[in-house]
C-alpha cells in the first residue's frame, strides 16, 4: 500500500512489531498515530515516522485501562479527523506456569492484550461504519491458536482476541469495514526478556520484527482475513487434527534438559 491520504493508529509502537509497523506505514506515506508507554522510545519512533509522514502524532499512554484506551482512540480520531486503519498491537507477556500466576496478573494481561483492543475498536467502529470504510488489524499470536505451556494467561488473552476478530469479521460483512487477524510466531522483540517472566522454552530462530511489519502492511489491503507471520498454519492444523499428539509434544519440549535455558 502507498497512499498519502491514509491515516493509521498503531498501539504498542515504542518497540518491536508496533514500532516497525509504524515506520513501515510512514515510509509508504501513511500518516500514523502511535501509542505506547515509554515516552523516549516513542519519540524516536515518531521522529522516524515524521521523516516520511510529517503530520504523524504520538500519545504516551498505558493501555491497561480499557476505558482510557477507548477515550484515546476517540481523541486520535478527533485529532486527525478520521482513522482509516487501527492496528491493535500492544501486548504484554506472562510466562509462568499456571500454578505461579495470580488472578490480578491474569486480569492485567487480559486488559492490555484483549480488553483495550476491544475498547479501542468499539470506540472507532461506529464512525468507520458511518463512513463505509476502514480496517481493524488485530495482532494476536500463534499462542492465540495454540495453548503454550507456561503461557496460560497470555494464550488466553490472544485466543480471546482471535475469537473476537472472527465474530466481528462476520458481523461487519457488507459495512465496508474490514477485519484482519495477524498471528505472529517467534519474533525478535523484547517480549522474550521481560521482568517477572520465566525463560522461554523456545530457543530457536526468531523472525525480525520488520518482516512482520511488512506482512501487516500487506494484510491491510489483502482479501484474506487471517495472516500467519511467518507461516505456521501447519502447526495449528496438526494440533486440530490430533490434540493428544500435540500435547505430548508440548510436554516433551517442556521436559527437555535445555528447556528454558538462555
PLM-predicted stretches and their roles:
Residues 14-15:
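Conserved glycine-rich cofactor-binding loop
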Residues 169-231:
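SDR active-site lid
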Residues 97-98, 102-107:
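Substrate-binding pocket helix/loop in short-chain dehydrogenase/reductase
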Residues 121, 157:
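Active-site helix of classical SDR
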Residues 39-40, 60-71, 103:
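The beta1-alpha1 cofactor-binding region of Rossmann-like NAD(H)/NADP(H)-dependent oxidoreductases
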Residues 141:
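Residue(s) in the substrate-gating loop at a strand-loop-helix junction
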Residues 28-45:
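Conserved glycine-rich Rossmann-like NAD(P)H-binding loop of the short-chain dehydrogenase/reductase
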